[in-house]
Amino acid sequence: MAIKDVQTYIDRHGLVETTDSEVDKPIWRRPGFNGIRSLLEMEEELSRFLRERRDALNLNREQVGMMVGLHQEIYARHERAGAKLRVARLLHLAELLDFSPVEAVYAAAPHLFGDSREEAEVKMKLIMRMLDLPSSTAQHLLMMIEELSPDSPLDNPPKRSKA
């Protein structure tokens, strides 16, 4: 059943009404560390992240485009924020360029990881360390964390403070 009063939801989650050049109507967003990053700025950060990953692997656009099934010029649009990056394409690129989708989300929206830049950086480092853990170590860490915080995050979504 839908929430009867969406304004209560908006207030509880610290959302603010804003405009964005990508959307014709007002939208609600959660402010980041320096206000609200536009949707285009987030696309540009995703693009920069993809380009840096590709460069770090010494691949060119033609090679990545071929692996994705796109002409190099079409793929290049993703690296210039000229084409919207669908989630499925991002996941495919994560497979090809050997990154976690979490890294891409962090590049575009670090404010989703903490209330300050420092907190977000710490949490991102922790996430990346956890992703590299052997399975048995991850299981032990999970058991330890569950002892510290017995409620499952799926049962009780985290309450984010208003930015």
Predicted features along the sequence, with ranges:
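Short, basic-rich loop-to-helix N-cap that marks the start of a DNA-contacting helix
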Residues: 58, 81-95
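Short alpha-helical DNA-recognition segment
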Residues: 55-77
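Interfacial/linker helices and their anchor residues that mediate assembly or domain coupling
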Residues: 112-163
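Short C-terminal boundary/hinge segments that cap the last helix of small helical domains
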Residues: 98-115
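N-terminal flexible/basic segments that precede or flank functional cores
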Residues: 1-44, 137, 141, 161-163
